[in-house]
């Protein structure tokens, strides 16, 4: 994960989760990846939570990124729906907590089995 994030570092990255902010930060800190994400939004960061696009749109605004320049990468149908509703390309991952079939059913634009595969999508 560190190697892939290091390659992506020149891009503006965010974490948008429905989890509360404090435990999200503990997870990111524990994985030693906080430095890669200048924007981290927890479930309480916006009035609406995913699958509503509001948290994704807020992250894009904070990063000053347009929808055409952005992609959401997620392991749940909520991620894919929120990204699509915000006008982003969507990438589902099959290595998360959600069963592959559920991620596929959300019909992401891309589907990857490893984080490293993401590099070929954003090259």
Briefly describe each language-model feature range.
Residues 1-15, 21-25, 53:
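Short, acidic loop-to-helix structural element flanking the phosphoryl-transfer center
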Residues 71-110:
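Acidic, Mg2+-coordinating phosphoryl-transfer loop and its flanking beta/alpha structural elements
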């Amino acid at each position: 994960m560190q190697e892939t994030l290091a390659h992506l570092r020149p891009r503006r990255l965010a974490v948008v989760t429905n989890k509360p902010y404090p435990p999200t930060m503990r997870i990111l800190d524990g994985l030693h990846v906080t430095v890669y994400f200048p924007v981290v939004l927890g479930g309480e960061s916006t009035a609406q939570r995913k699958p509503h696009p509001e948290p994704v749109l807020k992250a894009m605004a904070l990063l000053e990124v347009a929808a055409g320049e952005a992609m959401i990468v997620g392991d749940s149908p909520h991620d894919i729906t929120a990204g699509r509703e915000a006008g982003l390309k969507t990438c589902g991952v099959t290595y998360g907590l959600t069963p592959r079939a559920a991620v596929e059913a959300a019909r992401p634009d891309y589907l990857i089995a490893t984080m490293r595969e993401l590099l070929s999508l954003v090259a």
